[in-house]
């Protein structure tokens, strides 16, 4: 298993919990980070914590989109095609258990377990990027783009397709922040070319928490990865104290 992430303009305070939580799981695989506009102190911090830091002097497009193309390049450059890779956001991801046990050709977790049409943010993202496909997608359960896991050769192709599709989307200025582009493009691909690779069985790999304020604490137990926990006022403290829980 390889962990692959990307960031820019974050401090140690922003990513420290991500770095330390993975370390606390006992993860022994490779850890690779793409770092745009690098600062020497942050490079040193990451390298001291066992990360391979791949730096870029600029980020021509919005990072959530640009990272997909650069992740694909890196997978091929580092010959990671046969590895299982966990591609994640960095600031709001917490590892409770080592992800090395997750061996899926392609895994995406549901955003909030509701159809795209029932979520205003996902609806707007798809309507902006792919208005002609909204009718086809509106009753599909939205996938979250913050954590994507799979075999390297599949992810490299997925990310290349993601980049080409996004360049031709309805988002007109993708050098500026356009947070809906990444996730809407992931959903278009997930429900078309890559649908046959996805496992729709219930699992406890990743929990996306932004819209789970009404969830009971007992329903949070046992996941490998928690995403967007900082947005969840009710359960944030539960997540940040996970390494003290007896069931992990």
Predicted regions and their residues:
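N-terminal anchoring/stem segment of glycosyltransferases
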Residues: 1-82, 153, 248
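Short polar catalytic/cofactor-binding loops
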Residues: 7-11, 112-115, 231
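Short N-terminal binding/cap micro-motifs at the start of the first secondary-structure element
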Residues: 11-16, 117-118, 235-236
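A short acidic (Asp/Glu
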Residues: 15-16, 42-46, 95-100, 188, ...
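Short, high-confidence coil segments that cap the C-terminus of an alpha-helix
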Residues: 28, 80-82, 104-105, 195, ...
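GT-A fold catalytic core of metal-dependent nucleotide-sugar glycosyltransferases
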Residues: 68-121
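Short, flexible, basic/aromatic active-site loop/helix in glycosyltransferases
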Residues: 122-139
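Catalytic core and acceptor-binding pocket of nucleotide-sugar-dependent glycosyltransferases
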Residues: 137-240
């Amino acid at each position: 298993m390889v962990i692959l992430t990307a960031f820019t303009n974050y401090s140690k305070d922003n990513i420290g919990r991500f770095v330390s939580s993975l370390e606390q799981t006992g993860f022994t695989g490779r850890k690779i980070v793409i770092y745009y506009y690098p600062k020497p102190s942050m490079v040193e911090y990451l390298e001291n914590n066992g990360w391979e830091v791949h730096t870029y002097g600029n980020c021509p497009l919005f990072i959530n989109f640009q990272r997909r193309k650069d992740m694909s390049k890196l997978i091929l450059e580092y010959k990671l095609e046969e590895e299982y890779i966990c591609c994640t956001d960095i600031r709001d991801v917490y590892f409770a258990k080592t992800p090395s046990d997750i061996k899926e050709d392609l895994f995406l977790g549901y955003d909030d377990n509701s159809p795209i049409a029932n979520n205003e943010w996902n609806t707007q993202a798809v309507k902006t990027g792919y208005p002609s496909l909204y009718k086809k997608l509106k009753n599909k359960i939205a996938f979250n783009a913050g954590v994507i896991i799979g075999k390297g050769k599949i992810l490299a192709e997925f990310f290349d397709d993601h980049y080409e599709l996004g360049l031709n989307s309805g988002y007109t200025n993708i050098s500026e922040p356009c947070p809906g582009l990444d996730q809407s493009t992931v959903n278009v691909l997930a429900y078309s070319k890559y649908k046959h690779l996805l496992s729709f069985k219930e699992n406890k790999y990743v929990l996306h928490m932004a819209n789970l304020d009404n969830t009971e604490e007992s329903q949070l137990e046992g996941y490998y990865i928690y995403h967007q926990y900082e947005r969840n006022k009710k359960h944030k403290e539960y997540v940040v104290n996970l390494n003290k829980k007896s069931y992990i």
